[in-house]
């Protein structure tokens, strides 16, 4: 599941006070008023004033904001697409490099407990049936675990979710990393004592737990998330049978589509629940390109929403006090009738209407919503990293060492991811990241492995040049 960076400007001063916002709004209104008044004097065609400025200026400001949003979408959209391509590429490169060099992950030493049926059968029909049963069991486990996660999050069982994620991270960062490091040392014939290996694994795991579940530099957190995704993908590549793996990739794409887009889909319910609570998802589940908040999960900065709500409450209280206490209205606070007459002679009559107040409030909320640049960015689920890498790794392991098929799958996944982000920019809602990329990857794999590669072999055998 992917999210798009908010198409709003990145302000350097994210802690501007409310008075500064109001003063900036008034200053912009005065500039607009002076510009329009000069045009009217030049054309001799005056416009009615409302709240000291032309009535149509608010619409022009909104149109100008829309144009700036489109420009910033083009500017920052491509930047974040590249920022998402880099980690996906790194994860797939780690997996492919391991598959090509470490034979441990291509040997068939067993299967997962979720895939109990073997594919070493006498007939193709039995193998197909066993692969379908294995895929059904695996997808059922994924669906049940996803629903369990949504239920725990909906009922605020945060400690249970944290414990679940911490145990998973411990297994990946300590046990699977130890197995991976040991196999790499065996492959390259590196001699190392167990004490040194234990120190390496201890430091690697502890730093990873701190960076993922607590605090740490962004690049360090991203590196650990990429590494644990690659380790999980390698486990799937080793222990999933070939036909079962391809079938799981096809079915998981359909499930991802249903889970994200259906009104009662588990992932959509998770997003909507987080949006209602203005909460971020757990960092062990999501890769972020910046220190960000899921934009679709919170339609604005939570702090800004609190400020806006406080302003609205203040305005409501002021209105109520004005209606209930007419005596205080006689207290002009220094703004006498002479001052108002002098102001009207310079700026025109000051008439506050519902439309102008709404326009000013909208401008203030837009400024507040675009304050925090650290709350904008792209997020991609770690499951997407894992299944992208499983597809490329399986292609590398089962395509007879053919680099053409591996590269074709790699390019297909990036093309699908780019199209997904393009659709994300159009619809501006959370979209599943697996269907397009996995579909392209499967089509490219089978087309290259069974059509392109035999054709190229025949050309090379007969020494034909095209």
Curated annotation (Swiss-Prot):
Residue numbers spanned by region Important for cleavage of target proteins: 287-289, 376-380, 431-433
Annotated region (Disordered), positions in chain: 1-66, 304-335
A cellular component term, taken from the record's GO annotations: Golgi apparatus
Modified residue annotations for Phosphoserine: 50, 309, 330, 345, 370
Keyword Hydrolase: yes
UniProt topology in membrane: Multi-pass membrane protein
Residues bearing PTM Phosphothreonine: 328
Catalytic residues (positions): 256, 384
Chief location: endoplasmic reticulum
Enzyme Commission code: 3.4.23.-
Stretches in topological domain Cytoplasmic: 1-81, 153-165, 216-219, 272-379, 428-431
Subcellular compartments: Endoplasmic reticulum; Endoplasmic reticulum membrane; Golgi apparatus membrane; Cytoplasmic granule
Alphabetical keyword list: Apoptosis, Cell adhesion, Cell membrane, Cell projection, Endoplasmic reticulum, Endosome, Golgi apparatus, Hydrolase, Membrane, Notch signaling pathway, Phosphoprotein, Protease, Synapse, Transmembrane, Transmembrane helix
Topology feature Lumenal, residues: 103-131, 189-193, 241-247, 401-406, 453-466
Region entry Required for interaction with CTNNB1, spans: 321-449
Post-translational modification: Heterogeneous proteolytic processing generates N-terminal (NTF) and C-terminal (CTF) fragments of approximately 35 and 20 kDa, respectively. During apoptosis, the C-terminal fragment (CTF) is further cleaved by caspase-3 to produce the fragment, PS1-CTF12. After endoproteolysis, the C-terminal fragment (CTF) is phosphorylated on serine residues by PKA and/or PKC. Phosphorylation on Ser-345 inhibits endoproteolysis.
Disulfide pairings: none
Motif PAL, residue numbers: 432-434
Role: Catalytic subunit of the gamma-secretase complex, an endoprotease complex that catalyzes the intramembrane cleavage of integral membrane proteins such as Notch receptors and APP (amyloid-beta precursor protein). Requires the presence of the other members of the gamma-secretase complex for protease activity. Plays a role in Notch and Wnt signaling cascades and regulation of downstream processes via its role in processing key regulatory proteins, and by regulating cytosolic CTNNB1 levels.
Alphabetical list of PANTHER family matching this protein: PRESENILIN, PRESENILIN-1
Record family assignment: Belongs to the peptidase A22A family.
Subunit field text: Homodimer. The functional gamma-secretase complex is composed of at least four polypeptides: a presenilin homodimer (PSEN1 or PSEN2), nicastrin (NCSTN), APH1 (APH1A or APH1B) and PEN2. Such minimal complex is sufficient for secretase activity. Other components which are associated with the complex include SLC25A64, SLC5A7 and PHB. As part of the gamma-secretase complex, interacts with CRB2 (via transmembrane domain). Predominantly heterodimer of a N-terminal (NTF) and a C-terminal (CTF) endoproteolytical fragment.
Protein name from the UniProt record: Presenilin-1
Gene: PSEN1
């Amino acid at each position: 599941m992917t999210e798009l960076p908010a198409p709003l400007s990145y302000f350097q001063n994210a802690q501007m006070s409310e008075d500064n916002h109001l003063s900036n709004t008034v200053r912009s209104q005065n500039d607009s008023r002076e510009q329009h008044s000069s045009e009217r004097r030049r054309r001799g065609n005056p416009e009615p004033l409302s709240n000291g400025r032309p009535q149509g200026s608010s619409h022009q400001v909104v149109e100008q904001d829309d144009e700036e949003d489109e420009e910033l979408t083009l500017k920052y959209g491509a930047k974040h697409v590249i920022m998402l391509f880099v980690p996906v590429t790194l994860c797939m490169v780690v997996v492919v490099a391991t598959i090509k060099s470490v034979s441990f992950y291509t040997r068939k030493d067993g299967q997962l407990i979720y895939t109990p049926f073997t594919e070493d059968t006498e007939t193709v029909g039995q193998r197909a049936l066993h692969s379908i049963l294995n895929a059904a069991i695996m997808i059922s486990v994924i669906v049940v675990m996803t629903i369990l996660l949504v239920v725990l999050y909906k009922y605020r069982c945060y400690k249970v979710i944290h414990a679940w994620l911490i145990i998973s991270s411990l297994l990946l960062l300590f046990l699977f990393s130890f197995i991976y490091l040991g196999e790499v040392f065996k492959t390259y014939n590196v001699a190392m004592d167990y004490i040194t290996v234990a120190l390496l694994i201890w430091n690697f795991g502890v730093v990873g737990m701190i960076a993922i579940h607590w605090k740490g530099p962004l690049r360090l957190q991203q590196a650990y998330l990429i590494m644990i995704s690659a380790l999980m993908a390698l486990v799937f590549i080793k222990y999933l049978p070939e036909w079962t793996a391809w079938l799981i990739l096809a079915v998981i794409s359909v499930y991802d589509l249903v889970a994200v887009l259906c009104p009662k889909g588990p992932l959509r319910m998770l997003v909507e629940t987080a949006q209602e609570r203005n909460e971020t998802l757990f960092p062990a589940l999501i890769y972020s390109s910046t220190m960000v908040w899921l934009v679709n999960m919170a339609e604005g900065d939570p702090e800004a929403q609190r400020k806006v709500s406080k302003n609205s409450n203040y305005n409501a209280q002021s209105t109520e006090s004005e209606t209930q206490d007419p005596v205080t209205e006689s207290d002009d606070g220094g703004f006498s009738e002479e001052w108002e007459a002098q102001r009207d002679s310079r700026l025109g009559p000051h008439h506050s209407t519902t439309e102008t107040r709404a326009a000013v409030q909208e401008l203030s909320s837009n400024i507040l919503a675009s304050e925090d640049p650290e709350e904008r960015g792209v997020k991609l689920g770690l499951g997407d990293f894992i299944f992208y890498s499983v597809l490329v790794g399986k292609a590398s392991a089962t395509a007879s060492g053919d680099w053409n098929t591996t590269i074709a799958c790699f390019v297909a996944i990036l093309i699908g991811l780019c199209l997904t982000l393009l659709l994300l920019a159009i619809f501006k809602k959370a979209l599943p990241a697996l269907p397009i990329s996995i579909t392209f990857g499967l089509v490219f794999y089978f087309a290259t492995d069974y059509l392109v590669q035999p054709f190229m072999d025949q050309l090379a055998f007969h020494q034909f040049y095209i």
